């Protein structure tokens, strides 16, 4: 019979923190009315015979609130970078200026804002589910440890309460991040 270790709650807290961080990263790729360098993080460019992230072939900066500039390091890659940005589903139209691409960020329509808010809500729900799954894993480990007499019943209940507190805290942070992102999206 395999021995059961005493469950360590910090590993579950770390996993929940990673779920919240992943949500914030996903939110970064959602287009709002303002320019953000992270908007282009998901774009891959066909470069040197393979698909590479845009950040590996160019420097992305935000000189103005509604403008992103992409400084391509290799002059021969400008066309590929422009093509990748145009083909992305972000609806952006870069303007080529030598080795620099200027990408004006058009204002969002009300309909598009609502769609983005729904997408943000979907991302948040995915992470809430992930946090709940982590809670389930933690509680299963606690039950197994109690069953194998590694921890007492009282300790199991105390730790389950702690796991629930961690879950509530993580979901609260997810909800706060969603609220902030929705406000950012709906801001005209």
Swiss-Prot record:
One of the Pfam families matching this protein, by short name: RRF
Domain of life (superkingdom): Bacteria
GO MF term set: ribosomal large subunit binding
Keyword annotations of the record: Cytoplasm, Protein biosynthesis
Spans traversing the lipid bilayer: none
Location in or out of the cell: Cytoplasm
Main location: cytoplasm
Gene Ontology CC: cytosol
Signal peptide: none
Family statement drawn from the similarity comment of this UniProt entry: Belongs to the RRF family.
PANTHER family recorded: MITOCHONDRIAL RIBOSOME RECYCLING FACTOR PSEUDO 1, RIBOSOME RECYCLING FACTOR
Family annotation (NCBIfam families): frr
Its job: Responsible for the release of ribosomes from messenger RNA at the termination of protein biosynthesis. May increase the efficiency of translation by recycling ribosomes from one round of translation to another.
Protein name as catalogued: Ribosome-recycling factor
Organism this protein belongs to: Phenylobacterium zucineum (strain HLK1)
């Amino acid at each position: 019979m395999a021995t059961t270790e005493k469950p360590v709650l910090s590993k579950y807290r770390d996993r929940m923190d990673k779920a919240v961080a992943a949500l914030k990263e996903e939110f970064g790729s959602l287009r709002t009315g303002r320019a953000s360098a992270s908007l282009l993080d998901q774009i891959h460019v066909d470069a040197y015979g393979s698909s590479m992230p845009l950040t590996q072939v160019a420097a992305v900066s935000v000189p103005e609130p509604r403008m992103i500039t992409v400084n391509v390091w290799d002059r021969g890659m400008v066309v590929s970078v422009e093509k990748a940005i145009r083909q992305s589903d972000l609806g952006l139209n870069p303007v080529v200026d030598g080795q620099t691409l200027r990408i004006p960020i058009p204002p969002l329509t009300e309909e598009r804002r609502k769609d983005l808010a729904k997408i943000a809500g979907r991302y948040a729900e995915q992470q809430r589910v992930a946090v709940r799954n982590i809670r389930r894993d933690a509680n299963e480990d606690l039950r197994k440890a109690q069953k194998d007499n590694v921890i007492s019943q009282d300790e199991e209940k105390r730790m389950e309460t702690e796991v629930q507190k961690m879950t509530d805290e993580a979901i609260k942070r997810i909800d706060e991040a969603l609220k902030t992102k929705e406000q950012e999206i709906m801001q005209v």
